[in-house]
């Protein structure tokens, strides 16, 4: 019995105190033996609280960049043989970048163009055309951002400002701006049937020259139909003789005397002749 009692007393002396003591007092030197257990117990109690608070908090409203992507509101019209007119919706953003490149060159862009910070409508001139009139497929991508300017959000879109991370100070070219690109694939041959396609439209100078030449041709044609008739008739021999006889006949013909005055004229002429004879006979005897 004594050895068993001694073993029980030795085991009881080695057990730590259950309550109080220096090990439970906060701020005292030394680490309690059950510090890891207390830390894990504290974490187990704090984790459900964090999860509960996160679940109860309302979800934050996302900005325009997190909203579901709207369909591409891009339209392309062909103005002339080598120019395109591009339009897109303003709600896509204020500052937009536009990329245009060909896609049917087996990985190489036969034509590529980039426009930085532009707005609709945009006229793209001097468009590169494939040699030989081959079919040319193009891809047009418009990327817009809301960082440097915002317009009124479209109907149904969230009104809260997007929570962008604070940009670090530095040059503007180092501060990235989110861009949301929307691409449109099309072919130049497909644009011929659109209302905006006017392949035969020419510059104003060519139009004026064409109108002037048309007017000259019409006037010359009318003159050619009218003028040759009298000109040709005037240079013919019969026409020349007829004109000469017609011009000389009025000058050679004597003055016409009326029929009623013939007898009076003859009597007057006879009286004049008798008077002349009497004067002559009277003067001769003297």
Swiss-Prot record:
Glycosylated residue positions: 73
Location of the region described as Disordered in the Swiss-Prot/TrEMBL record: 20-43, 52-71
Protein localization: Membrane
Expression tissues: Ubiquitously expressed. Brain is the major site of expression.
Record's signal peptide: 1-20
Post-translational modification: N-glycosylated.
Top-rank lineage group of the source organism: Eukaryota
Main location: membrane
GO cellular component terms attached to this protein's record: membrane
Transmembrane segments: 215-235, 263-283
Membrane topology, record value: Multi-pass membrane protein
Keywords: Glycoprotein, Membrane, Signal, Transmembrane, Transmembrane helix
Annotated Polar residues bias: 33-43
Family per similarity comment: Belongs to the TMEM158 family.
Function description: Receptor for brain injury-derived neurotrophic peptide (BINP), a synthetic 13-mer peptide.
Protein name per its UniProtKB record: Transmembrane protein 158
Organism: Mus musculus
